[in-house]
Amino acid sequence: MAINAQEISALIKKQIENFQPNFDVTETGVVTYIGDGIARARGLDNAMSGELLEFSNGTFGMAQNLESNDVGIIILGDFSTIREGDEVKRTGKIMEVPVGEALIGRVVNPLGQPVDGLGDIETTGFRPVETPAPGVMQRKSVFESLQTGLKAIDALVPIGRGQRELIIGDRQTGKTSVAIDAILNQKGQDMICIYVAIGQKESTVRTQVETLRRYGALDYTIVVTASASQPSPLLFIAPYAGVAMAEEFMYNGKHVLIVYDDLSKQAVAYRELSLLLRRPPGREAYPGDVFYLHSRLLERSAKVSDDLGGGSITALPFIETQAGDISAYIATNVISITDGQIFLQEDLFNSGIRPAIDAGSSVSRVGGSAQIKAMKRVAGTLRLDLASYRELEAFTQFGSDLDAATQAKLNRGRRTVEILKQPLHKPLPVEKQVVILYALTHGFLDDVPVDDILAFEEALYDYFDAHYDHLFETIRTTKDLPQEAELDVAIQAFKAQSNFK
């Protein structure tokens, strides 16, 4: 049989062309150091910053330091079984978390894995934890009100949808209570809430989850928790995971309230990681980019344009101060990033004024444009009245010889302080807030004893519910005050039939 060299050559060429190599090419490296939530590895010369890397035990890490000899990695999970010499490989992906409706009502860790014992979360959607914030032209002005249900906030430091409002104060001054009450008040408001617990005790997180469940708020809330017992990388990544979940809803035209409790602990975790990765320390041993740590997080909260769905993320970040020092490094950083701050004072808290909001140091830079018209009309001078009362109260300590006008201001001020008090987990709808503040600013409480103010308030609401519910409905639907004469008649009728003369 004659062998045709040309045919053989053509056959070999065809085989080569059709050859499909089944190689899985992965760049791998070797762990050279492991400890305290970080690892170093050699051989990953092409790793990208923020890339997910997989260790031989299945744990993932994130590339943070790209150096000439090795890569500094933060480990997102258990690192107790990782050893020097273990293999670590590139994945070519960046960190993503599951997102979507399936997460609502669940308690998850910063990787999106459920920790509430209610089974797996069935969702197909994922979002990267690090994404650019919306640009200037992708945003809208804040104009829709977000009601917290707390008179002291809704009247003095109003918050709008898409705003970033810092809650700052010492430990045990009621910061978490303010945020939980704000979440409870979103029931029926078409809002999705995300509570991010950073470095909290697991028992504390359990208590907050039970509170949300008891009041029916878990039906529209996601809880993301990185407890104090977890490695620093998870505390560092938790807020970014929370806002990634929020962005999924925002870009689908929904409104989200996200609470970061608290960013001081995230900054401490980031400082710990940075020092372990041998980054140069700066002021208070924080790394040079600690401002960027918080700015890139909080800038992702926005009211986006109609082209992007018109949704919003409203952020309530917490910062814990030491001895009321709001001029500390992290505190001033976050104050400069946010659109205002609510300062909770220990002295006020201990004297029974709760929420312990210091009206003089608290401000909302953009919330005024979102405040409803009715609240603007009744609370317009409230802040000034309160400030002048505090000033006069300081003067009265030096002498008691006061003229009638000064005495009247002091009397009104004492009643204002009482009215702004509120029991825990009892947020008020805005129409009730407007009515009681109207009664206060128009002098209807001037003859009511200070000790009876809170009882007067409760009785007034019950009376209006029974006889003047249409006034509540008017405020609720029109966002404006009803006829003042009608309000005056209603309040006078209540006083006439009550024991509060």
From Swiss-Prot:
Q: Specify the protein's topology with respect to the membrane.
A: Peripheral membrane protein
Q: Which GO terms describe its molecular function?
A: ADP binding; ATP binding; proton-transporting ATP synthase activity, rotational mechanism
Listed EC numbers: 7.1.2.2
Annotated site (Required for activity), which positions?
A: 362
Q: Which domain of life is it from?
A: Bacteria
**SUPFAM superfamilies in UniProt:** C-terminal domain of alpha and beta subunits of F1 ATP synthase, N-terminal domain of alpha and beta subunits of F1 ATP synthase, P-loop containing nucleoside triphosphate hydrolases
Q: Which residues are listed for ATP binding in this entry?
A: 169-176
Q: Which InterPro entries match?
A: ATP_synth_asu-like_sf, ATP_synth_asu_C, ATP_synth_asu_C_sf, ATP_synth_F1_a_nt-bd_dom, ATP_synth_F1_asu, ATPase_F1/V1/A1_a/bsu_N, ATPase_F1/V1/A1_a/bsu_N_sf, ATPase_F1/V1/A1_a/bsu_nucl-bd
The main location is: membrane
Assembly information from the UniProt record: F-type ATPases have 2 components, CF(1) - the catalytic core - and CF(0) - the membrane proton channel. CF(1) has five subunits: alpha(3), beta(3), gamma(1), delta(1), epsilon(1). CF(0) has three main subunits: a(1), b(2) and c(9-12). The alpha and beta chains form an alternating ring which encloses part of the gamma chain. CF(1) is attached to CF(0) by a central stalk formed by the gamma and epsilon chains, while a peripheral stalk is formed by the delta and b chains.
Q: Which family does it belong to?
A: Belongs to the ATPase alpha/beta chains family.
- Protein name, per record: ATP synthase subunit alpha
Q: Which organism is it from?
A: Streptococcus equi subsp. equi (strain 4047)
